């Protein structure tokens, strides 16, 4: 059962890519433990900017982001990973010249000794990767690359995963597979914030949803 005690909170977040040009203008968001939260809205509304701001890729110029009450605003990516926050971008989310196994090992750069334990749990969710360990990521289909990217994030043993449009550019069948897998990941105990253009499918699998419009 989902526990709605706050795990991650964005409180009045103001952020943008250029000084004085704010894309987000005071956004509030709460993620509970074991919860899957969707963020939908039109193109250019600031959805991707929000998850990038949470992950420290876009500077937070106002408001605060907290994880279990700790201010994590503007922390570096490696500091957030160490605190259990993972991020899967929409594009360039795998290393195309590396094999699937090498991509997964990149998710363990902080804890390389945990390979045996983590790979076993990841392959329970992504069994098809077991036979693809030596395949270069760049030769995989779009759906397979997305699964590999999510798998690598799970190798970090995160408490929170930020997903930026995981279904973008995929066939309807692969979109369904991605959405089903996202729900399974959440049901395994990982809290998820998912930005998504496919509002209907997003809201079907999410516990709650936010609509973002013009920041």
Regions found by a protein language model. Give the residues of each.
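A short, flexible loop at the N-terminus of ABC-type nucleotide-binding domains that lies
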Residues: 2-10, 14-26, 33, 57-59, ...
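Conserved catalytic motifs of ABC-family nucleotide-binding domains
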Residues: 157
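Conserved ABC transporter NBD signature motif
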Residues: 63-71, 83, 115-124
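Walker B catalytic motif
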Residues: 165-166
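ABC-type ATPase nucleotide-binding domains, specifically the catalytic core motifs of the NBD
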Residues: 18-19, 37, 59, 75-77, ...
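The feature captures the beta-strand-to-loop junction immediately N-terminal to the Walker
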Residues: 40-42
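ABC ATPase C-loop
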Residues: 153-154
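Conserved ABC ATPase signature
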Residues: 136-140, 144
